C-alpha cells in the first residue's frame, strides 16, 4: 500500500502541472516571430496563440486580436485547442477523484483498499490528461518546425517556439509524473480480508475402549 507522503507528492506535482497547463493554454506566446533572417524588422515581435495573435512594439506596448474564425485556423491549432481543453477537464476531474482516495483525507470512507483504488483511478486520469497535453504541444511544435524549414515559407512569416509550448511540456511532464505516483496506490494482489489460520479439529478416537 502506498504511503500518504507519496500520494501527497504525486498530487502536488500533478496539480502544479495542471496549473501550468492552464497558463500555457491562456497565454498567446505559442509561436513567436523568428529573427533568423537578415531583413527581419526587430522593432516589433509577433506572437500566435490558441485564441489570439499579438504584436509587441519595441516600446513594450502589446496589442492583441482574437481570431475571427475557428474554421480558418490551421488544423494543428484546432487540434491543439481541443486537446488542451480535454486535458484541463480531465485534470480537474482527476483532482476531484484523487482527493477522495488519498489517505490524508476522510473522503471515500474508511476502507483503505477502496481509497487506494480511488487514488489509483485519479492517477490514471492524470496520466491521460498529461498525455493529451503532451500530444497537443508536440503536434503544434512539429508544425512550427515543419513550416520553419519549409523553403516555400517566406522568411518574414516564419515562427519559432514560444514560451507557452515549453510551459505546456513542463506541465505535461509534472502531470504525468504526479499521476504515475498516484497510480502506485494500487493495492495489487493484496486481499481485503485478513489471513485466516486453518481451523484445527480434534482427532476422533475411534479405538476408544469400552468397559
Curated annotation (Swiss-Prot):
Residues 210-211 are annotated as: Interactions with TJP1, TJP2 and TJP3. One of its GO terms (cellular component) is basolateral plasma membrane. Directly interacts with TJP1/ZO-1, TJP2/ZO-2 and TJP3/ZO-3. The phosphorylated form interacts with EPCAM. This is Claudin-7. Keywords: Cell junction, Cell membrane, Membrane, Phosphoprotein, Tight junction, Transmembrane, Transmembrane helix. InterPro entries: Claudin (IPR006187), Claudin7 (IPR003552), Claudin_CS (IPR017974), PMP22/EMP/MP20/Claudin (IPR004031). It comes from the Eukaryota. One of its GO terms (molecular function) is cell adhesion molecule binding. The chain crosses the membrane at residues 8-28, 82-102, 120-140, 161-181. Residues 1-7, 103-119, 182-211 are cytoplasmic. The gene is Cldn7. PROSITE patterns: CLAUDIN. Belongs to the claudin family. Plays a major role in tight junction-specific obliteration of the intercellular space. It comes from Rattus norvegicus. It is found in: Cell membrane; Basolateral cell membrane; Cell junction, Tight junction. The keyword Zinc-finger does not apply. GO terms for biological process: bicellular tight junction assembly; calcium-independent cell-cell adhesion via plasma membrane cell-adhesion molecules; cell adhesion; negative regulation of apoptotic process; negative regulation of cell adhesion; negative regulation of protein-containing complex assembly; positive regulation of cell motility; positive regulation of cell population proliferation. The keyword Phosphoprotein applies. Phosphorylated. It is a multi-pass membrane protein. Residues 29-81, 141-160 are extracellular.
